[in-house]
């Protein structure tokens, strides 16, 4: 297989293709502008097609029903001042942490000057995820960590860009649909 996506300009760098590949044939490589794109190692690729199946650029967009749209405002003015978007992330993640769940989200790594996704089950870790980053985050091996937590029956909250959330959703839908077939 030559490439995962049909059009590189539509690739969001969600890493679903990299994580779903059973042959570890895909690596995420930075372009000149620092954006991560999947590159296939043709020597490892077995043309199974899983990467194309999970790639959201190969999917038709579905309409959003009004019933699936929600509005949040955190009822805590102190926390709202520390948050973005009305504190929805804080409100939802508080419940996850209270239920001994885990949160996956983006932090800005000051030492390496980049945004990365991490896992946390503590308030301080969650607080590091708050605020807007406005750059692509490196999702690394988060998919396997999410999978392990789900297998351990932990409540999981995944946050990221819409493209990253869709990538995670497609990955788990494909993974568990494939296993059941």
Labelled PLM ranges:
Residues 176-181:
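Conserved small/polar residues in nucleotide/adenosyl-binding loops
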Residues 116, 167-171:
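A short acidic (Asp/Glu
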Residues 3-4, 16-39, 49-67:
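Iron-sulfur cluster-binding cysteine motifs and their immediate structural context
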Residues 96, 172-175:
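Active-site catalytic pocket residues across diverse enzymes, especially alpha/beta-hydrolases
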